[in-house]
Amino acid sequence: LNTKGGVVDKVVINNFADRNGNKNVTLFQGKDQNLNYTFATKDGYISTADLFFTPSEVTDTTVTFTAEAAAGKTLTIKYVLGNEYMLHTSISATGMAGILNPSVNTVDINWQQRCAQQEKGFTFENRYATLTYHKSKGGTDYLSETSEKIDEVIEDKIDWVAFKNQFFSAVMIAKTDFGTNNTLTSIPQEKGTGYLKQYKARLKTTFDPTGAQPTQLDFYYGPNDFRLLQQMESQSNFGKDLELERLVYLGWPLFRVINRWFTIYVFDWLTGFGFNMGVVLILITLLLKGITFPLVKKSYLSSAKMRVLKP
């Protein structure tokens, strides 16, 4: 965490190796990520990026950052580390009624990240690096993974935005929603730079200038693991059907159904025996071929007969 701006400055995901052989994956650090909250005042704006915060109530799992505008007038950002990979965040104002614009009940959020390359193969990893978002009415969508998209306007209300690479994601989740007409940007990076995409999200969510109700956000920094992402919904405590597991690509519609309701369960069952990943994948492949063989048997026999009869 950084006292300048009061934001997360570096995220390391333990027990996952990166392309350089490091035992832990650094999702981002320093200038690779920027997060700024902007509040409307009676004569302009206050941006957290311009403020220095003082930490207090520091424990192994919590910290409170406070920036003082004047005596008794403060902005507070509180972080609580949840189980696994979830970080709970609340933002509130105290005694700021004379400074903040009482007619503006939203906060502008500007979030940017350069998505770092984690795998040795750039092209394949880049194909699955996408800026993904979840609509409040249900379902997810994403910006193109191959072409440049700048300030794409999302008219629907959205619950979360994910800066995703192939195996890991940084996700921002709003307790209420991010309203309408948010803008999202995804710019592919050149091979050899060490980065996959430049992501940017300009969002807006509710904020109480009186300080009576804090703005609540959750951040997920972790692997794109189907079962784990399903569990995150209960950890967010927002009471929403977040569908974070949709961050895991399961293929085209037909294959998605097969993978969702068959392959994943078989995978869980086989890994429960302690087999390594390579063995599990081989067994699943053999099992799927065995199941589909009766369906393609006639085609194989017909093809074989044609080869025999061919002059």
Segments predicted by a language model, with ranges:
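Soluble non-transmembrane domains of integral membrane proteins
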Residues: 2-243
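Active-site-proximal structural scaffolding
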Residues: 84, 259, 263, 306-309
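Interfacial loop/helix-cap signal at membrane boundaries in integral membrane proteins
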Residues: 222-276
